[in-house]
Amino acid sequence: MGFRLKVEGQETIELGLDNIQTVIYDTDTPDDSNARSTDVGSTLRISGKIITAVDGDSADDTLKLALWSLVPAEKADSYRKVTLEVIAADQVVRKVHFPNAFVVDYNEHFGDTEGVGAFTLYIKQKKDKTELATIDGGYPV
């Protein structure tokens, strides 16, 4: 199974099968509700490897993710269009699309023995635009 992430804004950020290791999609509603809540949110938590550029290869786009996480809320570019594809056996199992996503948390981890770093990106769809988020899948790549 593999993953492809595309973030579109003033610049395009793309991470692929080599970078992304785990993805968690979550529909978030209040836990203390006794009926279906209108307070619904959608989130993605994406984790993977930071790949170092070697032998003239270009660096991966994790640096661009880190820079996106620093964009202040006052700027329109803090919200971007995000598409995540989950791929298995040449099938798109899931395609999650957030047209107005923003970064909640971004972390990078480095150690002196691992050889590469790791990242975790936690994004949400803007709550007043949750109905614009889409999930589909079950078709060839």
Task: For each feature predicted by the language model, list its residue ranges.
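Glycine-rich, low-complexity intrinsically disordered segments
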Residues: 1-141
